[in-house]
């Protein structure tokens, strides 16, 4: 934290002069220093100037560095382009990370990500592998004909968490066809309306 405070001071003193110098320092920072920088990047003056550093962190193979950027961090949702944000969300899923720790999922959800989620789910199903139910959250407002079939499959699944995830997607969707899928799932709808079932409580027993 002390280092972040120092960076704030020097950047406020002369942002144009110190920004490239700090970027160079970050390139040679050790893992712990880089994690701290990424976690508190949003607190720096003109944080957009360090976007290249944040984007570069998406490519790291060090999970703690990646998680410092992806988890409970407002920076990606505020400054990443869709392709970069999608990459972060998908990599978290591929690494079997905690998708619920990513901020502003509903705000940053987009059509391309929804399509990729469906395609990836089909690959996992074909291989007989499970999918984190939270993975479906970004498709909520992009449920097309293909995703309608995915939602129906999840609602008919023997996995209770998949039922709940699909119910949340369909209930909050702007697509009438998605809402229609819930006509025979009154208990799930009631749980959502009573605020017993939310994305935050999805995995609670």
Region locations from a protein language model:
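Alpha-helical scaffold domains
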Residues: 1-205
């Amino acid at each position: 934290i002390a280092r972040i405070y120092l960076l704030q001071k020097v950047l406020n003193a002369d942002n144009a002069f110190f920004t490239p110098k700090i970027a160079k320092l970050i390139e040679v920072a050790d893992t712990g220093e880089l994690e701290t920088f990424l976690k508190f990047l949003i607190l720096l003056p003109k944080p957009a100037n360090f976007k290249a550093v944040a984007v570069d962190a998406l490519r790291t193979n060090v999970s703690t560095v990646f998680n410092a950027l992806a988890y409970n961090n407002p920076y990606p949702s505020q400054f990443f382009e869709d392709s970069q944000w999608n990459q972060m969300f998908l990599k978290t899923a591929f690494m079997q990370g905690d998708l619920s720790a990513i901020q502003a999922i509903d705000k940053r959800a987009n059509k391309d990500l929804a399509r990729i989620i469906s395609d990836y789910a089909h690959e996992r199903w074909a291989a007989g592998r499970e999918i984190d139910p939270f993975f479906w959250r970004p498709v909520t407002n992009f449920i097309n004909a293909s995703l309608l079939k995915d939602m129906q499959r999840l609602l008919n699944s023997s996995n209770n968490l998949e039922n709940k995830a699909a119910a949340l997607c369909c209930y909050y969707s702007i697509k009438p066809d998605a809402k229609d899928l819930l006509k025979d799932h009154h208990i799930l709808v009631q749980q959502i309306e009573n605020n017993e079932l939310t994305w935050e409580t999805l995995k609670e027993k």
